[in-house]
Curated annotation (Swiss-Prot):
Keyword Transmembrane helix in annotation: yes
Lineage of the species this protein comes from: Eukaryota, Metazoa, Chordata, Craniata, Vertebrata
Protein name: Transmembrane protein 161A
GO CC annotation, single: membrane
Family: Belongs to the TMEM161 family.
Amino acid sequence: MAVMGIQMVVTLLVASLMQRVSPHYSFGRWLLCNGSLFRYKHPTEEELRTLAGKQKPKAKKERRTNGVAEEKPLTVPKDIDLRLDTQPINTMDALVLRYFLEYQWFIDFALYSTIIYLFTEAYYCVVDAQNEINIGVLWCLMSIIFSIKVLFTVMKHYFRSEEGGERSVCMTFAFFFLLIAMIVTIVRDEYLEFGLEPGLASVCHNLENFLAQQGWQWSMPFVKLAFKIALVALCAFLGGCLTFPGLRLAQTHLDALKMAADRPMLQLLLHMSFLPPVIVVVLWIRPITRDFLLNAPMGKESVELMSNSAYNTFRLWIIVLLCLLRFCLTRFHLQAYLCLADRWVEQMKREAGRISMLEIQRKISRIFCYLTVVALQYLAPVILTFHCVFMLKSLGDYSWGLYPEPPGFSPVVDSSPVQSHSPTSEEEEDTEDVQAAVEQIMGVLTSLRGLFTPLFFRGIFSFLTWWVSVCQIITSLFGLYFHQYLGAS
């Protein structure tokens, strides 16, 4: 409590509130069950028999002729005039959804993490609390970890598929993203301004001083190589996890545009919500954005449109606003997915032959049961990007523009020995031994905390934010091509 102060109090209050309020009111549950989304109900066997012109099966005694039971008809023509009834999604309907509890907990946790982060930002604006641990950063870090965990859980679902096609798609894209990440990590900062190399150099310098203080020797080039290998492996893993979310986003985007054919303003917003990954990627390409804005050509002269700190703030706000825009259009994408049931029925009517009643019911029910999976695929990348930006701002010592940006610094590990007083008695000797041990432990913890500089955090979270957008661009563009040309053929 003394270390974190009021932040710990607010954290405990929010955690208690989350535990007590979530069973009664859940933001994630409200997103699905507020009455704006409607599902298509599958037809009963009696309705299908009526549409097919078949009589109701006779009683069990009447169906036996010469000791042989008459088989129950299970198929109907595909071209029957089937029209699906709709019903708003309520809480009881949502309980049968796949991964509904995981979805509800994840969305609620992301919301409370954002609330705590906003509180800590306001607290840091009012109070000089630079020596306190920023508890909001810890919540954002957990949101990032849970976002990746949710995406991995959904990806594992595809790996359990019996057909194996989804598994091959994920592995192919993961290997493809591995190659791209290997290329990106060797691009100089003059083109992609992540700042990974300066940040890694500062960490290695502090680590070398820390190890020398402990009497250890370590090869710094090996540390840099191991870090880059781990970063490339993480990029490939994220690429595999973001494969099907990107493909699904492309499908729901096309379907949402068809639903909004008579609403041009909504179509404009849908197009704008599809472009955020492209804008985020461009924001870190130095010759196109920062160099242009800092030295904009005006005739024969160059004009500085904004400063370096102003551009950093501008980039943070742009990403936050784009994430909020995509979040606000969640309902239209989810409804576009639910309308796949009606589209499938219309496609079935244009085909010849017969189809099982059970298959019709199963297909329509399956679309609704996977609604939360689609919601996680849509919202998890948004939440991941959103909280990566929060981490970039706080740990990278950036500013929202509401107060001056603190200067970046690279703390050097202090190698001075811990001072201790000479004991005067046995009791004082024991007490001072404990104090010396505590001081030594605190000194080691302080040194470990000083290893990771704001320059390093700027590099790592800039890269992660940029990489998530790259994965979304590639997978969603491939999804557009697949659903428009390959899927339609």
